[in-house]
Amino acid sequence: MALQIPSLLLSAAVVVLMVLSSPGTEGGDSERHFVFQFKGECYFTNGTQRIRSVDRYIYNREEYLRFDSDVGEYRAVTELGRPDAEYYNKQYLEQTRAELDTVCRHNYEGVETHTSLRRLEQPNVVISLSRTEALNHHNTLVCSVTDFYPAKIKVRWFRNGQEETVGVSSTQLISNGDWTFQVLVMLEMTPRRGEVYTCHVEHPSLKSPITVEWRAQSESARSKMLSGIGGCVLGVIFLGLGLFIRHRSQKGPRGPPPAGLLQ
C-alpha cells in the first residue's frame, strides 16, 4: 500500500518553485535563500479511534499558516498567512478535511503491520512497602508496573475493595529504551491488621485487569507464616530423602550370578 501525501502540498511546492525560478530571483538577488517547509502531522488515539490532522506551512523557519482538523479550517499564524488562509478555505477546505481519512487513516493502516504500532507487551506488577512494616504507623505502598507497551496505562489503588484517591501519587512515565515503559504509583497509608490493599492495572494488552494484593499483618504473624513455609519446605525435602533411601534398600545387595551361568 503506497503512502499518501496531502495534495495541497504539491500545489504549494509548485508555486514556490515558480517564484524561485522567476526572472526576479536571478541577478543581484541570486545569493538570497528562501526556504519553504510543510509539515503534515497525524495524531492517533487508540489506533484509529480518534485521529487529528495538523498541516503546518513554514517560510524561512516561521510558521505562517496552519490547518487543524479539530478547528476545521485554515488559520493564519502570521499576517503573511492571511491571504493564503482565505484562499485555501475557499478552494481546498473540503479536500483538506477529507485527508483525515485519505492520508492519516490510509497511511496508518498501510504501515501498522510493518511497525510496532500493533505491538502489545503485558505489564509486570509488583507491590512493595517503602519501610519495614509496622502496623498502625504511617507508611507507603509502591506498585511497580514495568515492561509494558504501548504507553497508555491506568493504575489504581483499592483498600478493602474501595478505591483510594487521597494519598496517591505517581512518577512520570519512564521509557526503558526498548520501546517498553514503567511507572511507579505510590499510596500513603497507615496499615491496620486485616486490611487488604490492591493495585489494579488496566492496559490495552490485557483482556482483563491485573490485580495484586497486599495484606497488612503484624511482625509475629509474618514470622509465623515464614516459619510455616520453611517447615513445609524442610518436610518435603526430608520426605523425598526418606523415599529415596527406602527405594534403594528395597533393591537389596547385588550378589554373584548363579554358578550354573559361569559354566
From Swiss-Prot:
Keywords, comma-separated and alphabetical: Adaptive immunity, Disulfide bond, Glycoprotein, Immunity, Membrane, MHC II, Signal, Transmembrane, Transmembrane helix, Ubl conjugation
GO molecular function term, any single one: peptide antigen binding
Main subcellular location of this protein, as a coarse class: membrane
Signal sequence bounds: 1-27
Membrane topology recorded in Swiss-Prot or TrEMBL: Single-pass type I membrane protein
Entry GO terms, CC: early endosome; external side of plasma membrane; Golgi apparatus; membrane; MHC class II protein complex; multivesicular body; plasma membrane
Post-translational modifications: Ubiquitinated in immature dendritic cells leading to down-regulation of MHC class II.
GO biological process: adaptive immune response; antigen processing and presentation; antigen processing and presentation of exogenous peptide antigen via MHC class II; antigen processing and presentation of peptide antigen; immune response
Localization per Swiss-Prot or TrEMBL: Membrane
InterPro entries named in the record: Ig-like_dom, Ig-like_dom_sf, Ig-like_fold, Ig/MHC_CS, Ig_C1-set, MHC/Immunoglobulin, MHC_I/II-like_Ag-recog, MHC_II_a/b_N
Glycosylation sites: 46
Entry keyword Disulfide bond: yes
Region listing for Beta-2, in residue ranges: 121-214
Matching Pfam families: C1-set (PF07654), MHC_II_beta (PF00969)
TM annotation in the entry: 225-245
Domain Ig-like C1-type: 123-211
Family (UniProt): Belongs to the MHC class II family.
Protein name per UniProt: H-2 class II histocompatibility antigen, A-S beta chain
Species this protein is from: Mus musculus
